[in-house]
Amino acid sequence: MVYEGDIWNNGKKGRPEIALHMNENFLVAVAVYVVSKQLKAVLLNIKGDVLAENMVNVSSQMENEDLLGILVELIEPLKQKKPVGAMFAGVGLSFFGNFNKIRQELIFSMRWPNIKNFSFKQLSDSLACEVLISTSLEAKLNDLLLDEPHYGSGGTLLYHWGYGIGATYAMNGVVVESTPGYIMEAGHVAVDLNNETKCRCGNIGCLETEAALWALLPDLAKVFPGVPENEDEFKEFYLSHHLGSGELILHATKAVALSLASLYQILHPERVVLLSPFLMDEAVYDFMKRQFYMRTSPYTHGDVEFIRLEPEFRGEIYGSTAQLFKNSLQKELIVQD
């Protein structure tokens, strides 16, 4: 865990001082996460340095066996790149979808509708290492809770509006979870009773059909050919082409503001952390907040803080692997009888 540096003698009696340095590569892990239609993986050390990366495009029509093979092919090359002498802590996965953490299964993901009850135990056996799972937003929020100590007090709502729409919530530093795996499905709640559009999830009138990037892309592409569907690439295109001034985005913003207001009225978090390429446009951000305040109790407005994160925020890399590092350190540091 540590190694000795230079010996320094200050001229006084006694043993000379020896500098001790942290061995940053003592423990490494792999984080796997989703960006639009891509699966990405990174090998990182306990300090958080990314040592190697891998990426693959995935089909929305893939099935359980396809996902298992893709994950093994994505992760194994990174395991082989661990530094000499390093211990491998395991793999942290952060996906969009519903997880049963007791059975260690991905129950359903709108992005991969053909996958049902995917077993992460099987993946763990294939990789011969520990595998931990979480939703993308849970992992991001866990990272924020580690990096921002004041988030540990009161309620924190993390809301994502991008290719899809979702949310997660923490109270006093603890992320709220559900044993069956269904919780905070913000993108799959109807905000317009007249909307009868069928969503990818199978429901009718979901918020995502009105505001998610995947639903807006066909109409945007009619006016702006070449609009990217990759969320990281979309932000620059969106800002440079001033898409936020169009009626399509303003309508979507109203729908998202109503969703946020409903969650706020139920949870009353002290802070609302926003992760969205759409809200990087200052005019759209201001419009969203005005719509939000119109739909929430005036006496609560002084109690909420809005915080914007850059859409490229990759906190899930660290949030999904923190427990792996903790587990490995405990094994090394606790004396075994």
Each model region followed by its residue ranges:
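Glycine/GP-enriched mid-protein hinge/lid loop-to-helix segment characteristic of carbohydrate kinases
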Residues: 53, 125, 129-236
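Glycine-rich phosphate-binding loop and adjoining helix at the ATP-binding site
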Residues: 58-60, 64-155, 283-295
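Short glycine-aspartate micro-motif
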Residues: 29-33, 88-92, 156-160, 166-168
